[in-house]
């Protein structure tokens, strides 16, 4: 076994017991989290579950590093995606409109090109902010938009979104479960992809949205905060805007963000600019791999 001398606060011990998680962190040369913001968040009591002192120390020493996940462009790219009926790319976007029509037809919603189409592919849990969407989805209906949801999870959330679809059959549709091909079509055919998570270490859905020109609407947390730049007049002018971001985990904050998305939708040229800038972002594994190599080379 391990030497008894290792069982102390500067070793294996955590609250009188052996913690293998703490031990691994303590004795490692470096640890990685899946985004820079999450690496900061886990140094706080809210996220660290008693390890905030250790994690804060590691962060200060440069031994805790946040590196974002990457997107596999052989699977998730609108010009090669095997699951979508119409391929497209940045300089030729006609396929995106066709995918939108296919998606609307699949969900039996009006095939209206002018309707702002929101999509959400997720586990139906509180962490994913599903309750926030249920309480603010009427804003999408009020403004003539569409909402399509794919996912499964907590029974009361499944029931909640079913009730939304029953109440607004011309605007909201849902499929309970998971369907790989449909998830790709939703990312390709939507205009906005919703990721209103309460916490999100990295998140991949918003990265797929950027890749496909489906603007992410996200809460400012974890990897979502690192990957999506809010569309303000300043950021749009600076060509840095890539989506929509809200801060408070409340239905009111999400509702206001939805309103801002509709406002931008009414400005086609500005929308196209943001979409272009979103699609030009590089969140490939090439970029992530280079960051890992840089870290490993300095150990």
Language model region names:
Residues 1-299:
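Catalytic cores of nucleotide-sugar-dependent glycosyltransferases that transfer UDP/GDP/TDP-activated
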């Amino acid at each position: 076994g391990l030497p008894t001398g290792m069982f102390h606060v500067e070793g294996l011990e955590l609250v009188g017991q052996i913690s293998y998680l703490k031990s691994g962190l303590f004795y490692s040369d470096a640890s990685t989290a899946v985004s820079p913001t999450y690496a900061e968040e886990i140094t706080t009591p809210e996220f660290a579950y008693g390890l905030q002192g250790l994690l804060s120390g590691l962060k200060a020493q440069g031994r805790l590093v946040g590196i974002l996940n990457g997107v596999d462009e052989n699977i998730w790219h609108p010009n090669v995606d095997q699951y979508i009926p119409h391929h497209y790319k940045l300089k030729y976007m006609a396929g995106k409109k066709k995918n939108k029509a296919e998606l609307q037809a699949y969900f039996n919603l009006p095939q209206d090109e002018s309707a702002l189409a929101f999509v959400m592919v997720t586990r139906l849990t509180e962490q994913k902010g599903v309750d926030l969407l249920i309480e603010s989805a009427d804003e999408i209906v009020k403004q003539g938009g569409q909402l399509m949801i794919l996912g499964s999870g907590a029974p009361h959330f499944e029931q909640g979104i079913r009730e939304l679809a029953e109440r607004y059959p011309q605007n909201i549709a849902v499929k309970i479960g998971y369907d790989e091909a449909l998830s790709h079509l939703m990312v390709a055919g939507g205009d906005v992809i919703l990721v209103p998570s309460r916490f999100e270490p990295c998140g991949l859905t918003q990265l797929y949205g950027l890749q496909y020109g489906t603007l992410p609407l996200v809460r400012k947390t974890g990897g979502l905060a690192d990957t999506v730049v809010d569309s303000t007049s300043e950021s749009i002018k600076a060509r840095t805007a890539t989506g929509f971001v809200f801060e408070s985990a409340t239905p009111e904050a999400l509702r206001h963000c939805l309103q801002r998305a509709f406002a931008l939708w009414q400005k086609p040229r500005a929308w196209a600019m943001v979409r272009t800038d979103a699609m030009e972002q590089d969140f490939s594994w090439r970029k992530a791999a280079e960051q890992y190599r840089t870290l490993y080379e300095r150990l």
